[in-house]
């Protein structure tokens, strides 16, 4: 765990998915919402954190593959945060797009749907593992980030289900 001796940094992952595989799931505003959120975080972030602001935007408006809202890019970004962030830093994650739930009873999880998915049918484990981010995935990736201050915002249907899994983040070891 990295402990910063200096001032805290802000790390933000902002994800918007408007354009899905095919046209059945396409939405109008998540890309715009992500751009607006990133702009707001940058404006407020520079007031509070000065030049110590790192914002990563992943959306379907991205022009190069590493800027697209894919599962791989989301995971890569959060793993980078885990390597760079210290205990005194702040991490914010924002997701706008489709969300759904899948699973039986207590194994039911929230799933954020990424760019390459074409339907909300998650019965195929390959689809879930390659084209979605589950609340379990997100909990695992965020737990690996040493920052004691983490905020997750979902603008997606069924996102209340994510709260159950993410509530375990409150159990992080917060000793200095």
Model regions and ranges:
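Short consensus segments that form the blades of beta-propeller domains
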Residues: 3, 26-28, 102-103
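Pro/Ala/Gly-rich low-complexity, hydrophilic intrinsically disordered segments
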Residues: 1-10
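Signal peptide-proximal N-terminal region
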Residues: 36-53
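Short, intrinsically disordered, charge-balanced linker/junction segments flanking boundaries
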Residues: 171-176
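Glycine- and acidic-residue-enriched helix-capping/strand-helix junction motifs
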Residues: 21-39
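Acidic/histidine-rich, surface-exposed loop or edge segments in extracytoplasmic proteins
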Residues: 12-23, 57-62
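Caspase-like (clan CD) cysteine peptidase catalytic core
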Residues: 9, 67-167
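Short helix-loop-beta-strand segments that form the rim/entrance of peptidase-like active sites
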Residues: 48-64
């Amino acid at each position: 765990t990295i402990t910063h001796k200096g001032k805290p940094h802000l790390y933000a992952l902002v994800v918007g998915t408007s354009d899905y595989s095919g046209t059945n799931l396409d939405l109008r505003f998540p890309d715009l919402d992500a751009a607006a959120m990133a702009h707001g975080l940058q404006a407020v972030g520079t007031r509070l954190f000065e030049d110590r602001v790192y914002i990563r935007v992943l959306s379907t408006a991205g022009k190069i593959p590493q800027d697209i809202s894919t599962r791989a890019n989301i995971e890569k970004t959060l793993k980078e945060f885990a390597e760079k962030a210290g205990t005194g830093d702040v991490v914010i994650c924002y997701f706008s797009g489709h969300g759904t739930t899948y699973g039986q009873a207590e194994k039911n999880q929230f799933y954020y749907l990424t760019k390459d998915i074409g339907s909300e049918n998650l019965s195929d484990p390959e689809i879930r593992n390659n084209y979605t981010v589950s609340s379990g995935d997100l909990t695992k990736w965020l737990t690996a980030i040493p920052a004691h201050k983490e905020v997750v915002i979902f603008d997606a249907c069924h996102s209340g289900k994510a709260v159950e899994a993410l509530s375990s983040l409150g159990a992080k070891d917060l000793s200095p």
